[in-house]
């Protein structure tokens, strides 16, 4: 695929280790040839596991290239919405903004689930006396939820940086800037 992209679009796609090993401050940059590079984390969560996956985006010549290790729910949801809603996305920047917006929605849903589970733990603790074993189970559950909450917050911070970068490089049109500001407000509402 890399060779095909190079031949078809004159673009050199980064290797996987180049995508993952960047410092936070080096995740957003513009090449001399006009390519815009963005590395953004996307959260993936199942009942069994949760993790972030770094995705590399390159905007070049009216196209958006993305590199990721695996399929993500946010990409599937974007494709579903684009098929069902004409003009949901009009250009490559809309696609990128919508992916970032969907990631915020996805994160908000997970945060809501965290608070629901923490509420159940609170009711257990406040509702009756507990044995040491039961208290240990509750404490362990709280620690798991707080760990998940911290990773979601870090993911949202990364999304905020990506949107801010897109707005700062003045690449977006007025409507897209409005969408970017709305994404930032949505992130702020989760703090």
Task: Name every feature range the model reports, one short phrase each.
Residues 1-185, 189:
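Peripheral, non-transmembrane regulatory/ligand-interaction domains of membrane transport proteins
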């Amino acid at each position: 695929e890399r060779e095909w992209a190079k031949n078809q679009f004159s673009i050199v796609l980064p290797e996987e280790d180049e995508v993952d090993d960047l410092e936070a401050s080096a995740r957003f940059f513009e090449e001399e040839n006009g390519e815009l590079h963005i590395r953004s984390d996307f959260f993936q969560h199942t009942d069994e596991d949760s993790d972030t996956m770094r995705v590399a985006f390159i905007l070049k010549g009216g196209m958006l290239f993305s590199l990721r290790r695996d399929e993500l729910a946010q990409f599937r949801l974007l494709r579903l919405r684009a098929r069902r809603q004409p003009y949901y996305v009009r250009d490559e920047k809309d696609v990128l903004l919508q992916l970032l917006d969907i990631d915020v929605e996805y994160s908000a849903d997970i945060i809501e689930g965290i608070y629901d589970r923490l509420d159940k733990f609170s009711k257990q603790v406040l509702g009756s006396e507990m044995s040491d074993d039961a208290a240990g189970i509750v404490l362990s559950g709280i620690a798991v939820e707080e760990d998940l909450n911290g990773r979601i917050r870090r993911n949202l911070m990364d999304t905020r940086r990506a949107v801010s970068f897109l707005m700062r490089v003045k690449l977006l049109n007025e409507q897209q800037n409005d969408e970017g500001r709305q994404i930032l407000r949505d992130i702020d509402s989760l703090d």
